[in-house]
């Protein structure tokens, strides 16, 4: 992956640039991500917060409790409504980026599908990827981090 990579909202008001490779990436199929994305899942890559530079107005954050029961904060542009960021208390040193906000969405390489028990029957899950019923356990999460290196 060529660094840095960048992205932003639809109207261009908020831009970001990341100087580090993603730590891990996944497609989350929990009901909260379905509602937030208006689709079957939310494609997200997580990067070190320290490697992310954001310019423009501050994103509006709304905190909800995800299907896991844990709080998740989603950041969006107040001008155009584009979903950009995800902050999860489970990974406090990381910033989630919605793959659709990338300037080049083809750099998104999901490693795993999570919360597939909540995926609608009409959802197309990639059979070549690991599909977890819920979120990864500690061992599976460490494997994700090791696999992204």
What are these regions (language model features)?
Residues 1-8, 13-149:
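A short Gly-Trp-Pro
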């Amino acid at each position: 992956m060529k660094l840095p990579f960048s992205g932003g909202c639809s109207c261009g008001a908020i831009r970001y640039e990341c100087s580090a490779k993603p730590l891990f990436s996944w497609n989350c199929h929990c009901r909260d991500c379905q509602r937030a994305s208006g689709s079957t899942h939310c494609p997200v890559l997580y990067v070190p917060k320290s490697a992310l530079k954001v310019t423009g107005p501050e994103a509006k954050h709304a905190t909800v409790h995800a299907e896991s029961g844990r709080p998740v904060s989603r950041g969006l542009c107040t001008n155009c409504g584009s979903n950009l960021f995800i902050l999860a208390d489970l990974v406090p040193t990381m910033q989630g980026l919605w793959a659709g906000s990338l300037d080049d969405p083809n750099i998104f390489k999901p490693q795993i599908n999570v919360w597939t028990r909540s995926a609608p029957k009409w959802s197309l899950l990639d059979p070549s990827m690991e599909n977890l019923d819920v979120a990864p356990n500690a061992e599976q999460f460490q494997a994700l981090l090791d696999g992204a290196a």
